[in-house]
Design a protein with these regions (language model features):
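Accessory terminal regions of nucleic-acid processing enzymes
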Residues: 1-171
Length: 171
């Protein structure tokens, strides 16, 4: 086996780690309708499949309804005009898949996704844009089921010490 590359010193990773507590605090200020808890390095596990885990950026409780949800914080940088296409009227697939995975692992009813996008304008000005998305579990039940099915299949390869197919199936 080859040890994975340590990316902890990369500027983008450092920025994301440093920005996360500040973005969490801004979210709390902007959304008094939630109670929020954060425990660093907390690992939450699926009740039936303990190999399905997540480490939340925040746990939310909706005031008045007591609906439980999560907060996911992302920082990203768009380096070209084509990068905006991934954000046009949607969130990128990898972020959506992670949110579905979190709802699967935790049973949450929703996830609030807070994204800070850094970019440079055509005039050369550095800018930041913060976007907020609320993803409801009820709206993505089929996708959560697909994530569960895929995770269980992958884990079967691990427990049976089998190498999975090299070509990924279409999603």
């Amino acid at each position: 086996l080859v040890a994975p590359e340590d990316i902890g010193d990369k500027p983008q990773v450092k920025y994301g780690n440093d920005a996360e507590p500040l973005l969490r605090a801004f979210f709390a200020l902007d959304h008094p309708e939630y109670g929020m808890a954060f425990t660093p390095f907390k690992i939450m596990r699926h009740e039936k499949h303990p190999f399905i885990t997540c480490t939340p950026d925040g746990e939310l409780l909706e005031t008045g309804t007591d609906r439980r949800g999560g907060l996911e914080i992302k920082t990203t940088e768009i380096m070209s005009s084509s990068g905006w296409g991934r954000w046009k009227d949607r969130i990128p697939d990898e972020y959506y898949a992670q949110v579905c995975h979190q709802m699967l692992a935790t049973g949450w009813e929703y996830v609030e996704l807070l994204v800070q996008i850094k970019y440079t304008t055509t005039a050369g000005e550095d800018r930041k844009e913060v976007r907020h998305y609320k993803i409801e579990r009820a709206d993505c039940l089929d996708d959560i089921a697909l994530v569960e099915q895929s995770a269980v299949l992958f884990w079967s390869y691990v427990t049976e010490r089998k190498r999975p197919a090299l070509k990924l199936p279409p999603i």
